[in-house]
């Protein structure tokens, strides 16, 4: 296979979403070689996508590589630090590990990557590519040649008068140099202040623009047709079919030389958790719709109002009732966030007029030994044979584990009944004319409820 000179990167790693939504002709000018893992390749079951994979296989352009155990362990450790490990599947970890492995192989080490979230990168190393290395070697050779030539000694002649004049001249030059340094320092401070003010204004404007985007976001979509059915299923599973939500990419990255270290390996995926880990590791992300480098991604995460920790949204769609860090109940709120590829920082975008609802915090939970409890249960106290009202306040309570297990059983039971009623999704989408019977309802109640301090109306 001849190398593509118009490619953006040398190696492009493709996840399941790019392979399902686009064909080889869409990616052929994006990279010189394409990679994926065997598990992702076997995961694709869609008929049209399998036809596209047959084209990839016939051309021999898609390489199936399984990452090493060391790479998987490194990526898993980093994902645990970012908080995304709980929502990453084995295929997601393998894709990230393969990208990490190729990055180390093509750039001779992991000097471009972060060891842990928030680490500062060495800009001097990042800016030096292969051309820069050649220039450095040439400069070193010139310095060695200049050092090999012996320098002539300057012999000066003169007595005490010449020495006094020379010392006076050196004193004047030193004084002038000090004055120049002070003036330059004042100018530098003024310039730094003005630049800082400009940066603050730009950041304020940028954050306000982002907040406007999040507040004005609309969830309405198009009609689901047989043509976009696969994309609709992928969207429902929590992945992004447009490359990234709110991508901000740069057009100038198209024309950068392929020998630069930052243009060796890129990852194309629609999964936000994978994108989040990749950006915080400083791995390159490519928008598989436009072929441009993703600078920042925007999505939603869960933020605890008590401890301010941020967690990814569960992929299975199940609600999280307790904070994994502080154990707070009802404190997890959905929050818009953006991830920057340059710094790896996750920035939450909060509402400026947000007010926390303090309803239910006036009184503490009643004690089992209180007079009201004695009136309700009698002097015997807690009796297991009578109906109880056990308040769920912590995740490790046996009552919580019991209701979660019951809710999971109810969900599977209802799905089974619905599949039988619809007809299993046949070709003509046959629906039974009989009414649905046998559906069960089950709700998990956490805490005392919204109106815990309100007095109940007696009938």
Curated annotation (Swiss-Prot):
Changing residue 279 to R: Temperature-sensitive. Its EC number is 3.1.-.-. It is found in: Cytoplasm; Nucleus, Nucleolus; Endoplasmic reticulum. Transmembrane segments: none annotated. It comes from the Eukaryota. It is an enzyme of class 3 (hydrolase). Belongs to the NOB1 family. Component of the small ribosomal subunit, ribosomal RNA processing complex (SSU RRP complex). Interacts with PNO1. This is 20S-pre-rRNA D-site endonuclease NOB1.
